[in-house]
């Protein structure tokens, strides 16, 4: 198994859920990638190399503070990129 940052998957899922309700902003792949990168730069990395590590990190997702932190940074990233798209 390769080393990967599981936070990328968490942020991607949160971003997709958040964008479902947004109809007044650009949702092109460039903007989505910028939003994801912006949020990831503000959140701690969650590197995993095993199934056990992935499961442990997945369990952290149910913690209210963890979810709130991810949602806060995703919301900020959406606002920031929407105001200043790079295309």
Name each model feature, range by range.
Residues 1-87:
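Charged, amphipathic alpha-helical regulatory modules used
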């Amino acid at each position: 198994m390769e080393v990967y940052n599981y936070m990328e998957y968490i942020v991607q899922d949160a971003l997709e859920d958040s964008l479902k309700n947004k109809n007044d902003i650009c949702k092109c792949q460039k903007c989505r990638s910028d939003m994801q990168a912006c949020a990831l730069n503000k959140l701690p990395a969650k590197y995993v190399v095993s199934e056990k590590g992935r499961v442990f990190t997945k369990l952290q997702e149910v913690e209210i503070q963890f979810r709130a932190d991810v949602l806060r940074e995703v919301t900020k990233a959406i606002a920031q990129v929407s105001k200043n798209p790079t295309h």
